[in-house]
Amino acid sequence: MIEQYGIDISTAQGKIDWDKLARNEHLAFVIIRAAQGTAQDSAFDRNIKEALRTDIPFGLYFASGATTEEGVEAEARFAAEFCEAFHPQFGAWFDMELKKHAALGKRKISTLLRRWLEIVGETGTSAGVYTNRNWLKNLIEPAVFEKQDGARYPLWYAAYPNIEGRTLTDAWKDNRQKLSYPQAAIWQWTSKGRIEGISTNVDMNVCYEDFAALTGEDETPEEYVTVEEAARMLSNLGVRGVIL
């Protein structure tokens, strides 16, 4: 089984020293928050530029604020632009976890999740869902993850066991949480991790999926669009793009 260690970040982590991250021999990937709803994360410009510069493989995640199908479709189209611009090797992830979302009920939530996955998946990016044990058990229909071709949309599963250590490789100390959902592609095992280069606590993850195989690409694609080209693509949506 593949085990790759990574973190996920947003504006909450402040200014990150990406050179220190790049020197960490255990860090295999970073999942960057790209947006909340259809508003770009305020730290995204710097984070994506630095991920590209330091050649750290990355995924993107999108925090939802929508409660209607029309709203989720707009968020998905917004996310698709990021995916087409930046080709995230570790997937694009939909994070729907607010109280107003839970109030929608299982059937509606499942419909919204599935719609986002379908739209973003059309870009060729591996589109998945970030969620926790309670939502999986009570608020998401299992069929959400099933594709028509028999494959599955990947799951990024958050569950925090009682682990004393908080470094990247400490997840091995208690794998029972991961094993409770063996289909999880990524397990987020703590929100209190510490890593050189980031001054705050940070979420830490273990990836068990070969995303290069899912997308048909090498882990690090041979070609990206340039940062300038990506900025132009994002400007079509009225966002700032990448600050050079």
Language-model features: locations:
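Alpha-helix C-terminal capping segments
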Residues: 82-85, 120, 178, 214-215, ...
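Functionally critical loop-and-helix segments that line ligand-binding/catalytic clefts
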Residues: 1-11, 16, 24, 143-225
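Substrate-binding cleft of extracellular glycoside hydrolase catalytic domains
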Residues: 1-126
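Catalytic domains of cell-wall/extracellular-matrix polysaccharide-remodeling enzymes
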Residues: 90-174
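Short, low-complexity, charged amphipathic interaction modules
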Residues: 220-244
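Flexible, glycine-rich phosphate/dinucleotide-binding loops
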Residues: 39, 67, 136, 164, ...
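General structural signal for secondary-structure boundaries
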Residues: 17, 68-71, 105, 109, ...
